[in-house]
Regions:
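Catalytic strand-loop segment that frames the active site of acyl-thioester-processing enzymes
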Residues: 30-71, 150-156, 161-164, 170-230
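HotDog/MaoC-like acyl-thioester-processing domains
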Residues: 27-30, 34-39, 44-46, 50, ...
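Hydrophobic, proline/glycine-rich low-complexity stretches
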Residues: 25-112, 225, 281-282
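Acidic/His-leaning functional-site neighborhoods
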Residues: 197-280
Length: 282
């Protein structure tokens, strides 16, 4: 028999636990949230795909290191090559929700590199794609994880991952389930001391489906790295896409100042369209 007082005590405990958990979230920062992401090891069993390429002139900084926007393009390219090689029923209608890039060592201009990609986990409407960029001798240079959401072509709303794709990815996913919750949530952003500046859009920022391309967001992170030469490998960069940026809009960068790392929201009016963090990865 459960006494009334026992129920009251339990309810009070549950309320306090909920408040405690809420307080923990409130105390977190963009940095804490970004570094909490666990980059899974691999590749293990199951399908993996490898492509080799060279760091070319337009991919590198004047000092010769591979830029992060180039990394984002490489990730897109090898993902697309993999889906075509595996003959997915729907290789096109996927959008990136989040990209996490861990740089152990920056590839250099004219260096040959291998990109190996595999599935790190599956959800009902999305999948995590893990990619490792390595030197040709096998030395890991960059690890990345991108959360790709499958969308309906007509409505652009999330749609279930096709059965044939699940069958292809299941072995490498190893039973790992992933969710699409944001890491860099709005309430974690430090609003106390923010600098703002416009981010003018270019025609070249938009891709074949009319989206501001993932690589274009990483250009914003590169601007930070150009001004902070002390932030180099090992580093982590996180870019999350919340609301699509449309042609003709006027995005504004909101940057929390006074930090050694980048803490940024890209907003149009009061709406957060993207969130970014970049800093040293201890």
């Amino acid at each position: 028999m459960v006494l009334y007082t026992d129920v009251c005590i339990f309810e009070e405990y549950r309320k306090r636990l909920g408040q405690y958990q809420a307080d923990i979230v409130t105390l977190m920062s963009f940095r804490d949230a970004a570094l909490s992401f666990q980059m899974i090891e691999g590749p293990g069993s199951g399908r993996q795909f490898t492509a080799r390429r060279r760091v070319r002139l337009g991919d590198a900084t004047p000092n010769g290191r591979l830029r992060l926007d180039s990394v984002a393009r490489y990730l897109q390219d090898v993902s697309n090559d993999d889906t075509r090689d595996a003959d997915w029923s729907d290789p096109h209608w996927w959008v990136v929700r989040r990209t996490v890039i861990d740089v152990h060592q920056f590839p250099e201009y004219m260096q040959e590199i291998d990109l190996t990609t595999w599935c790190g986990g599956i959800g009902s409407h999305w999948a995590e794609r893990r990619t490792r960029i390595s030197a040709v001798d096998g030395t890991p240079l960059i690890d990345a994880a991108s959360l790709w959401v499958h969308v309906d072509e007509a409505t652009m709303q999330p749609s279930k991952v096709p059965t044939d794709v699940v069958d292809i990815l299941s072995a490498s996913a190893g039973g790992r389930d992933v969710n699409a919750r944001l890491l860099l949530r709005d309430k974690l952003f430090n609003e106390s001391n923010v600098n703002t500046s416009p981010w003018p859009l270019r025609f070249a920022d938009f891709d074949a489906v009319g989206h501001m391309n993932n690589a274009a967001y990483c250009v914003i992170v590169e601007e930070f790295l150009a001004a902070h030469r002390d932030v180099r490998a090992p580093l982590r960069a996180v870019v999350e896409h919340v609301v699509q940026v449309e042609p003709g809009q006027d995005p504004v960068r909101h940057i929390a100042s006074g930090n050694a790392d980048l803490e940024l929201q890209l907003r149009v009016g009061s709406t957060m369209h993207a969130a970014m963090w970049c800093g040293l990865n201890p």
